[in-house]
């Protein structure tokens, strides 16, 4: 089904809006994938907050022109699925994990603002923890000394109470 000029402009505007807010764009070739597999990928992408679409390459070229992702335009050849994400890791993680389980889905390239990534770089990015995981690790690291200090302070009255209980038990016996 061919799109008319107004529909194409709407698609370009929609993709341009997604790219403007994005931290990562990942491109993958999808030749010969079953519909149910692609549906599973879309469900997982939606759950992770990744904008996943199959688009005409010329429309995407227009959408990324004059953006920090313009370098990816040279990689847009063949039937491609586009993953666009505000989270720097989410699109890479979703698409890389899917490519592990489906050999007909091949990650071709990725981009971060003003940086083009190879498929290997996308795999490395996918292996990184998400922003939430990194923040929770940082918080745990910052909180550990304080928690240990509080436990140490709590130990003094606890030992005192145990000593009183031992004296009471000895006198009661």
From Swiss-Prot:
- What is the name listed in the Swiss-Prot or TrEMBL entry for this protein? Large ribosomal subunit protein uL10
Self-association and partners: Part of the ribosomal stalk of the 50S ribosomal subunit. The N-terminus interacts with L11 and the large rRNA to form the base of the stalk. The C-terminus forms an elongated spine to which L12 dimers bind in a sequential fashion forming a multimeric L10(L12)X complex.
What is the stated purpose of this protein?
Answer: Forms part of the ribosomal stalk, playing a central role in the interaction of the ribosome with GTP-bound translation factors.
Which GO annotations describe the biological process of this protein? translation
Q: Which family does it belong to?
A: Belongs to the universal ribosomal protein uL10 family.
Which keywords appear in this protein's UniProt record, sorted alphabetically? Ribonucleoprotein, Ribosomal protein, RNA-binding, rRNA-binding
Pfam families according to UniProt:
Ribosomal_L10 (PF00466)
Can you name one GO molecular function term for this protein? Answer: large ribosomal subunit rRNA binding
Q: Which organism is it from?
A: Thiobacillus denitrificans (strain ATCC 25259 / T1)
Q: Which GO terms describe its cellular component?
A: ribonucleoprotein complex; ribosome
Q: Which domain of life is it from?
A: Bacteria
Q: Does the keyword RNA-binding apply?
A: yes
């Amino acid at each position: 089904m061919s799109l008319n000029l107004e529909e194409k402009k709407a698609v370009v505007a929609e993709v341009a809006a997604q790219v403007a807010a994005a931290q990562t764009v990942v491109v993958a070739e999808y030749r010969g994938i079953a519909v149910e597999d692609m549906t599973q990928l879309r469900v997982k992408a939606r759950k992770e907050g990744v904008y996943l679409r199959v688009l005409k390459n010329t429309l995407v070229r227009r959408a990324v022109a004059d953006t920090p992702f313009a370098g990816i335009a040279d990689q847009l050849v063949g039937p491609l699925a586009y993953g666009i994400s505000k989270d720097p890791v989410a699109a890479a993680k979703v698409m890389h994990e899917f490519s592990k389980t489906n050999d007909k889905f091949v990650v071709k390239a990725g981009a971060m603002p003003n940086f083009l990534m190879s498929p290997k770089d996308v795999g490395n990015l996918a292996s990184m923890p998400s922003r939430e995981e990194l923040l929770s690790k940082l918080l745990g690291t910052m909180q550990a000394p304080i928690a240990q200090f509080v436990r140490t302070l709590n130990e003094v009255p606890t030992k005192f109470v145990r000593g009183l209980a031992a004296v009471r038990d000895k006198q009661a016996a």
